Structure formats: structure tokens, C-alpha cells
């Protein structure tokens, strides 16, 4: 099974924390979509005939894309790849884009999972992060989606925001749970160079929270969500049983995926490819760059990605894929963390 990823890089407003590639020039939407269709045709052999299990629209803000255009990309992909077994089609959205009319057309297009970028249910926190929506709009967006029949909704939350402690975080977690969503991704705020927060930090006007605060807030997220029946199945991801993110699992488990659009990444099992991070250059046809992974690269990625998940490393699988020597080395290198109980070894798995 394989995955398809479509990158829609446009945003109406740049969030204060975001260091992803994005563009605010929405006039380029139509030329970009035409180029994405051309890239689909050009890379029709990339997945080697593997059936597509998941499809994902990320950004940027994919909900700025007309639902008819989303349908066009999905329909085109279905003529090139075997999408008959596709189980999950996700679109990332800002709350203020999710009108009933938009949601209805999107659902008919085949989108069956929404990822709503709420980040916080506190208006002051949202304003600090330069988000477009407010808390009331976030609540209404999820409720509108539920009324339109969406039964698989995930929301993003951010914790570790300076000036907003446990009480604010607890209220946001409680608000998300009260909405009855099936999945919650909780990310710690990182202050990156080149972002609004990064520039303020460089001027001494913004300071990240300390490590003790980070640990306390992460523990609060874990305890609150697992206490509500969610599985903490990956570092930042929590799901009710049966609602884990299938597309993201492709990245953590070495599954093939094809990325379409500027700055999109792809993996065919041996090589990683990435498109130029520029709408202008992408439309102009700048070719993707590639890196062939050595066995050592693949092994290191295997260890790092598996340790992000609750299942961890299956040592028998590691031995089968990379040989006894490398599997044994994992155990040797992990010994200090096993002794401190930071890692646990049980039934042939280390997590």
C-alpha cells in the first residue's frame, strides 16, 4: 500500500510560529493546480503499481482550494493509480474556511477525514499566534463538519506557549474533548529562526518556556487525553481506538508515498525526492532533487521513526530488514535508556 500527498502552500495569513514553505499570493492558485496535474502525469510510474491506501492534502492551507479543484486532483490521480482501496482521504483546514456549503461539496469529492488547525480555544493565545479564527469559529467549524456527516475529525493543538500555562491548556483540551473529535494532535511550540516568534526572540522580546514547563504541559496532555480513552500512539498524536492517522503512519513505517506540489517530498523505498520550495520555480518546471538512501541511512531512519510510535522497534523485524549485527547494536546503544526505564523492552519490542 502507498500514499499520495498534495501540497497546497497558500495561506491568507502567516502564523507567528510557522516555518513551513508557504505563499500568500493566492493569485497563483490556478497555475499551481495546473502544474500539479502535470506532475501527476509525469510521475505516474513512481509508486510502481502499489495500491494507494491514503490521500492527504496538506499545506499551507488546503481549505483555500476550491472543493471542485480538490475533486479534480483526486479524480485525476484515480486514472493513474489504483485508488480503489483508498481508506482515508484527509484535508487540512482552517476553521473559518469550513462553511456548510464547502463541507458538503468536499465530502462528495471523496474527502472523509478533516484535520482542523485549531491550535487553541483561547482567543488571546490565538491572537498571539496570529491565527485567523477565534475560539467560537473553531467550535462551529467542527460542529458544522459533524452535521455534514464527517465522522473522522482530528484537531491540532499547540502547547508550551509563553504566557499561557496549564489552565489555558486544560481548557483547550477539555473543549476539544467536548466536541467529540476522534483524533487530537498536540504539538509543542518551537521557536524557529525566520518566523515572527523567532525574530521577536532574537530581539529579546519573546522567550520559549523552560524545560520543566514543557514536561509539565506534555504530561497534562498525555494524562488528560489517555484518561478520556485516547491512545497515545505517537509522540504528538492521540486517537480513539480505530482512528489512528493512517497516512502519517506511512512516514513512520517506511511505506512508499508520492508528494505532489512545491516543497512536497516523496519516497519510493530506496530514494527520497523533494520538489523545489517555490511556487514560481515549481510552475516553471524545476525538477525534483533526489537522495539515494544507504543501508545505514535506512537503518537510522527506521530506528528514529519507529521510536516515535508506541509500538517502537520490533527487533525481529529489524534483524530481518538490516541483519543481526545492526539489530544487536540497537540494543547495545539503548542500554543506558533501558536501565533508566526511559525505554522499555518487552516481547521483542523496544519502545
Predicted regions span which residues?
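Local cysteine-cluster metal-coordination motifs and their immediate loop/turn environment
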Residues: 9-20
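A short, conserved structural fragment
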Residues: 338-348
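Short amphipathic alpha-helical interaction segments
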Residues: 324-339
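Generic amphipathic alpha-helical segments used as scaffolds and interaction surfaces in large
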Residues: 321, 350-351
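Beta-strand-connecting loop/turn residues
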Residues: 11, 182, 256, 348-349
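Immediate flanking context of iron-sulfur cluster ligation sites
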Residues: 1-8
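Short, Lys/Arg-rich nucleic-acid/phosphate-binding segment
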Residues: 238, 347-350
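C-terminal scaffold of the Radical SAM
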Residues: 1, 22-45, 50-324
Amino acid at each position: 500500500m502507498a500514499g499520495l500527498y498534495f501540497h497546497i502552500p497558500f495561506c491568507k495569513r502567516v502564523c507567528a510560529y510557522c516555518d513551513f514553505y508557504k505563499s500568500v499570493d493566492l493569485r497563483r492558485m490556478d497555475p499551481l493546480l495546473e502544474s500539479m496535474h502535470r506532475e501527476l502525469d509525469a510521475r505516474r510510474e513512481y509508486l510502481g503499481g502499489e495500491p494507494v491506501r491514503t490521500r492527504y492534502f496538506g499545506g499551507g492551507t488546503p481549505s483555500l482550494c476550491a472543493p471542485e479543484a480538490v475533486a479534480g486532483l483526486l479524480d485525476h490521480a484515480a486514472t493513474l493509480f489504483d485508488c480503489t482501496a483508498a481508506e482515508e482521504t484527509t484535508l487540512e483546514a482552517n476553521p473559518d474556511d469550513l462553511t456548510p456549503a464547502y463541507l458538503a461539496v468536499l465530502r462528495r469529492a471523496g474527502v472523509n477525514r478533516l484535520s482542523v488547525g485549531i491550535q487553541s480555544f483561547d482567543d488571546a493565545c490565538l491572537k498571539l499566534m496570529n491565527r485567523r479564527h477565534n475560539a467560537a469559529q473553531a467550535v462551529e467549524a467542527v460542529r458544522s463538519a459533524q452535521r455534514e456527516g464527517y465522522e473522522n475529525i482530528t484537531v491540532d493543538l499547540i502547547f508550551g506557549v509563553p504566557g499561557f500555562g496549564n489552565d489555558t491548556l486544560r481548557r483547550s483540551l477539555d473543549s476539544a474533548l467536548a466536541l467529540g473529535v476522534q483524533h487530537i494532535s498536540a504539538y509543542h511550540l518551537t521557536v524557529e529562526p525566520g518566523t515572527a516568534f523567532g525574530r521577536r526572540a532574537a530581539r529579546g522580546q519573546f522567550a520559549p518556556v523552560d524545560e520543566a514547563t514543557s514536561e509539565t504541559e506534555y504530561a497534562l496532555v498525555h494524562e488528560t487525553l489517555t484518561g478520556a480513552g485516547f491512545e497515545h500512539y505517537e509522540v504528538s498524536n492521540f486517537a480513539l481506538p480505530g482512528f489512528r492517522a493512517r497516512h502519517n503512519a506511512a512516514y513512520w513505517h517506511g511505506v512508499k508515498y508520492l508528494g505532489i506540489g512545491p516543497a512536497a517530498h516523496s519516497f519510493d523505498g530506496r530514494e527520497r525526492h523533494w520538489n523545489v520550495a517555490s511556487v514560481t520555480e515549481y510552475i516553471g518546471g524545476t525538477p525534483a532533487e533526489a537522495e539515494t538512501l544507504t543501508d545505514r541511512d535506512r537503518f537510522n531512519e527506521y530506528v528514529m521513526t519507529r521510536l516515535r510510535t508506541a509500538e517502537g522497534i520490533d527487533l525481529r523485524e529489524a534483524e530481518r530488514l538490516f541483519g543481526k549485527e545492526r539489530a544487536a547494536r540497537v540494543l547495545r546503544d539503548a542500554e543506558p535508556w533501558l536501565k533508566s526505564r526511559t525505554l522499555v523492552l518487552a516481547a521483542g519490542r523496544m519502545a
